[in-house]
From Swiss-Prot:
Protein name per the record: Nuclear phosphoprotein UL3
Location of the protein in the cell: Host nucleus
Keywords: Host nucleus, Phosphoprotein
UniProt record similarity statement: Belongs to the alphaherpesvirinae HHV-1 UL3 family.
Region (Disordered): 38-89, 138-157
Length: 235
């Protein structure tokens, strides 16, 4: 088990008295043992302490530490080349996913309508895939939302709220390319006149900045079937 790092308070407590203990002294107090360094010809005397710590050098990524406890191998990441188009793996009442898309927009009017449109489009166009799509969530800054009428002088505007809005789509890695392409299509096919964004100077512009970020999980993510849009024909 890896021990936590020593806090600055405990390390610096001896300043002005016994002095700051060395890293080797701290490791020795934890029970670490050290071999006496043997500087052979051609080996620099500045060899790092890790080279002389018993059990610190790993002979092979597939072998345990010499003289130390065995460690379980790190679980490999999901393969991005899986081609099965069936429903995702199920674990009882849960459905397993490994890829997440985040669709976000900032300071945009009509953003809820846009994310609702994306959700409906994915439900219809990707009906043969099992996916999960969250409802719209919003985050705002510390700027005040409500102001008294006449609180701002004429010619000035209220501070920006910096409100952002996100939605999340989960799917299998094998279906990520289809989901990514469908997100691009539905975002680009929107009617620009229906959506507006607030620029930094306060003016409204007929455009919607929409950002799509993709994440891959090294471990399966499980959602209950009641929260998943199951593939057509899936039980």
């Amino acid at each position: 088990m890896v021990k936590p790092l020593v806090s600055y308070g405990s390390v610096m407590s001896g300043v002005g008295g016994e002095g700051v203990p060395s890293a080797l002294a701290i490791l020795a107090s934890w029970g670490w043992t050290f071999d006496t360094p043997n500087h052979e010809s051609g080996i620099s005397p500045d060899t790092t302490p890790a080279d002389s710590i018993r059990g610190a050098a790993v002979a092979s990524p597939d072998q345990p530490l010499h003289g130390g406890p065995e460690r379980e191998a790190t679980a490999p990441s999901f393969s991005p080349t899986r081609a099965d188009d069936g429903p995702p793996c199920t674990d009882g009442p849960y459905v397993t996913f490994d890829t997440l898309f985040m669709v976000s927009s900032i300071d945009e009017l009509g953003r809820r309508q846009l994310t609702d449109t994306i959700r409906k489009d994915l439900r219809l166009s990707l009906a043969k895939f099992s996916i999960a799509c969250t409802k719209t969530s919003s985050f705002s800054g510390n700027a005040p939302r409500h102001h008294r009428r006449g609180a701002f002088q004429r010619g000035t505007r209220a501070p920006r709220s910096n409100k952002s809005l996100q939605m999340f789509v989960l799917c299998k890695r094998a279906h990520a390319a289809r989901v990514r392409e469908q997100l691009r299509v539905v975002i680009q096919s929107r009617k620009p006149r229906k959506y507006y964004t607030r620029s930094s100077d306060g003016r409204l512009c007929p455009a919607v900045p929409v950002f799509v970020h993709e994440f891959v999980s090294s471990e399966p993510m499980r959602l209950h079937r009641d929260n998943v849009m199951l593939a057509s024909g899936a039980e």
